[in-house]
């Protein structure tokens, strides 16, 4: 069994942030000193800010990541960005399979899997997102759906050092709604069982994040749950004070 898994608090800025927003990032970097002793911190800004964000965070305790990548390293893919480009700009992580990508862009598990493989090819850590819809949860299919997404989206060869899995129930993202603590624990147990079944000891050490209306008010309760090794934060990551408060709540 692995020792205590070091938590990761990751901020997904989504399609938010101009150059002026780097001030919030600087505030996160300034406030990260003590928190970093026990928690890893990551901000995933829009692609336009990755290079200046990474440059600004040199020497700090805050990593920078991308929000998506193309499966190919280069080519005629207008508007897309490759994992190699993200790495070249200073990113060390990339989110793949976020529900907004799956829903708005029709990304399948196979597409997400290819993107995770691309992340590894470029030396990035892949944050693979999974989660059920409200209808799927109401039908009692949440565990089944998440298990299927894991099987299809996480490539073979996953290791604790190159994979993070984020559970984000689709119905909780940006709605203010949150599953019960029992619901979160049950799905995180399903994820852990899936990963250890496939990857043995490596699967035991993969960090499992919870995302979906995670905020300072509920962070301590959620982050203390079994198999919850951090959070993927949306709106609350846009303000340094909120992001750092969530990080401080890690046990």
Swiss-Prot record:
Per the UniProt entry, the Enzyme Commission number(s) are: 5.3.1.1
A Pfam family in this protein?
Answer: TIM
**Active site annotation, chain numbering:** 98 (electrophile), 168 (proton acceptor)
- Where is this chain's protein located in or outside the cell? Cytoplasm
- Gene Ontology molecular functions: triose-phosphate isomerase activity
InterPro entries referenced in this protein's UniProt entry, alphabetically: Aldolase_TIM, TIM_sf, TrioseP_Isoase_bac/euk, Triosephosphate_isomerase, Triosephosphate_isomerase_AS
Provide the binding site for substrate: 12-14, 174, 213, 234-235
Family annotation (HAMAP family): TIM_B (MF_00147_B)
Concerning its family, UniProt says: Belongs to the triosephosphate isomerase family.
Its protein name is: Triosephosphate isomerase
